[in-house]
A protein has these predicted regions:
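Extracytoplasmic beta-strand/coil segments of soluble accessory domains associated
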Residues: 74-121
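N-terminal periplasmic accessory domains that precede
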Residues: 69-76, 98, 111, 137-140, ...
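Outer-membrane beta-barrel transmembrane domain signature of Gram-negative proteins
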Residues: 314-316, 322-335, 344, 355, ...
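Gram-negative outer-membrane beta-barrel transporters
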Residues: 413, 590, 596, 600-738
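N-terminal periplasmic "start-of-domain" segments of outer-membrane beta-barrel proteins
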Residues: 33-64, 121-132
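C-terminal beta-signal and adjacent terminal beta-strands/loops
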Residues: 120, 676-677, 728-737, 759-815
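Transmembrane beta-barrel wall of Gram-negative outer-membrane proteins
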Residues: 179-182, 192-298, 302-320, 324-344, ...
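Short acidic/polar hinge/loop motifs at secondary-structure boundaries
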Residues: 115-154, 202
Length: 815
């Protein structure tokens, strides 16, 4: 039997695509879907729009075999990026951000049913450029069972939707069903036997008066941790000389693993409803709720480390060492209500009010504050992060018929008011305060006893708010049968940094019914999130200064608020909005009603890009802070606007549907995205050079931290109850730069990933499915020189495959 490699699978799939007149494709209903995002016209499909729009139906999302929306979109869209490598105890284990076109995860706007979605309260500070320093929208909190389709606008849209829409817009459209339903269960795990996943999901539609509907949906489940690290072969106990002693070998932590978090429980709910009130007037509403607990393991402290770093109290508490675990408890909810009025004379009005809240509580287990001695608790609540947002919007659209245009002129206008709040609440005093033993000499070790600093302190606690008032005006015209144009302008006033106005021009010309060209130019902006404006954190160490002097002092490592007095001494300033310009040009080819091919090229320039600085060392910080109240700050980081970037790229998307008559139907889909981001400006901050504020590693994350290109290919065969989907992805090269030594930079090679999903639907509505994500157990390149105890073999910036192959089976029932 021949052995089929991932490359061979991709070649075979590509050859199959070439056997038909165009690139591969979805079904006709996908090509003919009227889009909501990016236009106010009611007669525009994805292929007829003046900007590139992808539409992925709920069925296509389910066929990927993915467990959540972010992973499903990663499989389908070459422009969408969502690194799925283990995050350990980092904030990414509770909420990871996704991105478009290689930009940051907070540079894409997320809508639900066309309404702005609130962001996470968490800011991810680890080494993912699409998450580092960003407070993004958590897409995993909306169940796949609730989704009718997802629309992705790959174009700047701040003039249409406001802040954040620099890379594009993701609009999640919920199901609208007045009857029927589905219930299903899925079980799966990695080929190593870990990461077991269980998920129950379903939806149900109910009829409401006056042709109304209520659709409820949910999913609930859990996932065990997964890891691909090696055993810890250190000597654990003080005085040990061999790892082969019974005490060393029998330590229960010998096989500890650093990896993905253990999702002990997660459940998500949605409700979507609309009901007619009178002629032309209807009321609508939708809501989401999510709860998730994630246990994220830190690095193991063996007894020797506990004794040396925390003292005899810690060693007595944990004689066999400790594996600290941070539990993140997430609660998220959003409610939207509104009225729609359709009047032949006045036009279409949409009045909506929505509120969204995201909060994350964190607790450390197996903790200890040595300075509290035996009074230190083992479980320490380390604080709450909470963000909420209220939006009040009034939108109006009217078509004006006239004799000099091919179709009526579509005019839209609107008003928007938004209130944003962000709160940091301090945790237990044991997590941040110095007890009576602080800085005293440990009678057993002879070392100074440190404190314990974790989570949010009283110094970090903050409550921030701001208000935004905006107005927009939009005109779209089908000037002739071949030529359409659109102009949009939006002005907003922010209570914390003033006014901004942005515009957009979009054009499209159809040379023939099969071939069209499109282009757009726009300006955009992204206001700094309150999370970025308000973040402050610190850790404290007791060190001997100067070494050998016997003079022990407390020194601080701080992340400073950008507008704080401490940051000002380093040259820091209050954050200002990012500003962008976006140019794109594209071609659309539809040789057949069921086939299409699009090509779009773009350039995105971003000025004042918001970035979390590197941790500045004591050699830089201490001379500046000498003689000030901040003299004990030894190293510091803060958010800053000192870099400008340019992103160039192009995207190719193709679709084809092949009717096989009595043998069913084949749907092909292909896409390719290439982008290149470069830093075009890097300013100094006060007396500190810019390349120290944003060092080599961070610069590398921005420029080379994501794959330079991505290819997606898929084929779906539908026949007499059978559905078979084969999908192939290729991630291009990417790089990790060493912070100090270019010789230690590592370039990671291209990676192929193959998925398979097979399902059969019985006549009674029962469907059985089985499949694999990463069928051939593909892995990214291993990290060079980092194969230490418990440390992952693969970079946390790896796009996919660090855990290997994932196999699953599911059962569902339609009723």
């Amino acid at each position: 039997m021949p052995h089929h490699t991932p490359l061979a699978s991709a070649v075979a799939l590509a050859i199959g695509s070439l056997a038909v007149p165009a690139f591969a494709a979805d079904a006709n209903d996908h090509l003919d879907t009227v889009v909501v995002v990016g236009t106010h016209r009611s007669d525009v499909t994805a292929l007829q729009s003046a900007a590139p729009v992808d539409v992925f139906t709920g069925e296509k999302l389910q066929e990927t075999g993915a467990s959540d929306l972010s992973a499903a979109l990663t499989a389908l869209s070459p422009s969408f990026s969502f690194p799925q490598s283990p995050q350990g105890a980092f904030a990414g284990s509770i909420a990871q951000g996704a991105s478009l076109r290689g930009l940051a995860s907070d540079q894409v706007l997320v809508l639900v049913n066309g309404k702005r979605r609130h962001t996470s309260a968490n800011v991810t500070r680890q080494g993912l450029i699409n998450a580092r320093g960003a407070a993004a929208v958590d897409l995993s909190l909306i169940p796949l069972a609730a989704i009718e389709r997802v629309e992705i606008l790959r174009d700047g849209a701040a003039a249409q939707y406001g802040s954040d829409a620099i890379a594009g817009v993701i609009n999640i459209v919920l199901k609208e069903r007045d009857d029927g339903g589905n219930a299903g269960y899925r079980f799966g795990g990695y080929d190593k036997g870990d990461g077991l996943q269980r998920k129950l999901s379903g939806w149900k539609g109910f009829a409401l008066p006056n042709d109304g509907f209520l659709t409820l949906a949910f999913d609930a489940g859990s996932q065990d941790p997964a890891s691909d690290t090696r055993d810890d072969n250190r000597l654990f106990y003080p005085g040990s000389t061999s790892i082969n002693t019974p005490r060393e070998q029998n330590n229960r932590y010998r096989n500890w693993r650093w990896g993905s978090g253990n999702v002990s429980d997660q459940y998500n709910f949605t409700a979507n409803a609309e009901m007619g009130l009178s002629e032309g007037l209807s009321a609508y509403g939708f809501a989401t709720y999510a709860h998730k607990n994630t246990d994220a393991e830190n690095f193991f402290d063996p007894p020797t480390t506990l004794r040396n770093n925390y003292g005899s109290v810690a060693l007595a508490r944990y004689p066999d060492g400790r594996l600290p675990v941070t539990r993140y408890g997430l609660e998220d909810y959003a409610v939207t209500g509104g009225l729609r009025l359709d009047d032949d004379t006045l036009g279409h009005f949409d009045l909506a009010l929505n509120y969204g809240n995201n909060r994350v509580d964190s607790t450390d287990r197996d903790a200890i504050n040595p300075s509290w001695g035996n009074a230190s608790p083992s479980t320490i609540y380390t604080g709450r992060r909470e963000a909420d947002q209220t939006n009040l919007t009034l939108d109006w659209t009217r078509d004006f018929a006239n004799d000099w245009l091919f179709k009526p002129l579509t005019v839209s206008a609107g008003l928007a008011w938004r209130q944003e709040n962000y709160d940091l609440t301090a945790g237990d005093a044991a997590g941040w305060s110095n007890g009576p033993l602080f800085n005293t000499v440990d009678p057993i070790t002879g070392r100074r006893i440190p404190g314990y600093y974790s989570g949010i302190t009283q110094v970090d606690a903050v409550s921030l708010d701001r208000r935004v008032i905006g107005a927009y005006f939009d005109v779209e015209a089908q000037l002739t049968e071949q030529f359409q144009a659109g102009v949009a302008v939006r002005s907003e006033h922010y209570s914390d940094f003033g006014d901004t106005t942005n515009g957009k021009l979009s054009l499209r010309y159809d040379f023939t019914p099969q071939i069209a060209a499109r282009a757009s130019a726009s300006t955009g902006y992204r206001a700094p999130s309150l999370v970025q404006s308000g973040l402050s954190s610190f850790s404290v160490q007791v060190v001997e200064q100067p070494p050998g002097s016997g003079n022990w002092v407390e020194v601080q490592q701080r992340t400073l608020r950008a507008d704080s007095p401490e940051a000002a001494l380093l040259g820091g300033k209050a954050l200002k909005p990012e500003e962008s310009t976006n140019f794109s040009v594209g071609l659309v080819w539809q040789p057949l009603p069921n086939a299409s091919l699009t090509l779009d090229a773009y350039r995105i320039d971003i000025d004042n890009r918001i970035t979390l600085s590197d941790q500045l060392p004591s050699s830089v910080v201490r001379p500046i802070f000498a003689g000030t109240p901040y003299a004990n700050i030894q190293s510091a980081a803060f958010y800053t606007n000192i870099i400008d970037t340019r992103t160039d790229g192009f995207e190719l998307a193709g679709h084809y549907q092949l009717d096989l008559a009595r043998w069913g139907r084949l749907d092909f889909n292909g896409g390719y995205a290439h982008n290149n981001t470069r830093i075009t400006g890097l300013d100094d901050v006060g007396s500190i050079p810019g390349n120290q504020i944003i060092g080599r590693n961070t610069q590398g994350l921005i420029e080379d931290g994501t794959p330079e290109d991505k290819l997606t290919l898929s084929a779906n065969w539908l026949y007499d109850g059978w559905s078979v989907t084969v999908a192939q992805r290729r991630y291009g090269e990417w790089q990790n730069r060493n912070a100090a030594n270019p010789a230690l930079d590592q370039t990671f090679g291209a990676q192929w990933v193959t998925d398979l999903d097979v399902s059969y639907r019985f006549d009674l509505g029962l469907t059985l499915s089985a499949g694999a994500i990463n069928l051939f157990d593909s892995h990214p390149d291993k990290l060079e020189g980092a194969q230490l105890y418990g440390v992952p073999k693969y970079s946390i910036t790896s796009p996919e495959g660090a855990q290997g192959a994932f196999y699953y089976t599911s059962v569902s029932y339609d009723f």
